[in-house]
Amino acid sequence: MNTGGNNSLPPQTRGEVLFRDQQFFQKQIDSKIMQLLENYHNIIKISKVNDPLKNASEIYEMETRTSNMLNAGEGLLKIIEELKQNLILNDFSTMAEEVRIQNLVFHKENERTNKSIKLISEELSRSLKELEDEYYNSSYKLPPPSSSK
């Protein structure tokens, strides 16, 4: 066996991949929310000061903090979009299960329809046989048409 330089990890199960993705997204979400809270807290602190000399620098800092909050909010929206895409595009097990369930439903419906058709066919055969017996044993049966003229 050649083990030189190739440290390939064993394939991960779907659960491990989902858990890893969940942790990754959770860290990103926590980071963005902390940025939002920190910037909001700092804006509140700055807005309490009413010193005319510091107003220009504090206004600039408030604008910067607001910009940071917007960036963090946009980051959260991007994470949400990624989560939705990840869920939609990579949830093959749910899609496969849904297809399997629909397949079972259609097979059951097919079996039910086939049984129903078979019962109708048998009933039709019995009724036709009864009608034939009644006709051939009837005293009102018309004689066969004569072809001599």
Curated annotation (Swiss-Prot):
Summary of the function given for this chain in its UniProt record: Component of the Mediator complex, a coactivator involved in the regulated transcription of nearly all RNA polymerase II-dependent genes. Mediator functions as a bridge to convey information from gene-specific regulatory proteins to the basal RNA polymerase II transcription machinery. Mediator is recruited to promoters by direct interactions with regulatory proteins and serves as a scaffold for the assembly of a functional preinitiation complex with RNA polymerase II and the general transcription factors.
Matching InterPro entries: Med22
Entry keyword annotation includes Nucleus: yes
Tagged with keyword Transferase: no
Intrachain disulfide bonds: none
Family: Belongs to the Mediator complex subunit 22 family.
Keywords: Activator, Nucleus, Transcription, Transcription regulation
Assembly mode: Component of the Mediator complex.
Record's GO cellular component terms: core mediator complex; mediator complex
Location in the cell: Nucleus
GO MF term (any one): transcription coregulator activity
Main location group: nucleus
Protein name: Putative mediator of RNA polymerase II transcription subunit 22
One GO-annotated biological process of the protein: positive regulation of transcription by RNA polymerase II
